[in-house]
Regions:
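Alpha/beta enzyme core
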Residues: 1, 13-151
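A glycine-rich helix N-cap at a beta->alpha junction
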Residues: 2-9
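Conserved mixed alpha/beta core segments that line enzyme active sites in large multi-domain catalysts
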Residues: 153-155
Length: 155
């Protein structure tokens, strides 16, 4: 992909629409969507179960896919999709893999090339030793070695 714009949006349909509108007509764009996945955010902030959290990510990934395809058809903008399980470093490793796999399936584009999904794995609050984060990243790399880009993001 050539140089383009990168935009960030939470998993909210109204904001996804506005975000895609903001890059319509550019040649290339990376749309980066996120939703919080850690137990505290799931139970206290959003009052969601694991299943509801996955449903939220999958639903909004499908919206991103539909809207970016429409934008490409209308304006020619080529999109890459980046997903972050926000609060990744506080998320149970097996759940992080599960939600990323569900998002990848909903995006429906994988394999070699520019269509591969990008997983951004943020560690924004250091609550564990660095090797714990490294193990979490490794778990996702082992699952997604050939059909996704993995981008550790220690902030």
């Amino acid at each position: 992909m050539l140089i383009g714009r990168q935009v960030l949006t939470p998993a909210r349909e109204d904001l996804i629409r506005r975000t895609i509108d903001s890059v319509a007509g550019t040649k290339h764009a990376i749309l980066h969507m996120y939703n919080a996945t850690s137990p505290t955010f799931r139970s206290v902030v959003f009052r969601n179960t694991k299943e509801q959290t996955i449903e939220l990510a999958v639903k909004h990934t499908k919206i991103v896919k539909q809207l970016t395809e429409e934008c490409t058809a209308k304006y020619g903008t080529k999109f890459k999709y980046e997903y972050s399980p926000e609060t990744f470093s506080q998320t149970e490793p097996e759940f992080a893999v599960e939600i990323c796999e569900a998002v990848k399936a909903a995006w429906g584009k994988s394999g070699i090339g520019e269509d591969r999904i990008i997983f951004n794995l943020p560690t924004t609050v250091e609550i564990s030793p660095p090797n714990h984060y490294a193990d979490q990243v490794r778990n996702l790399i082992l699952i997604n070695r050939s059909d996704a880009f993995i981008t550790p993001s220690p902030d």
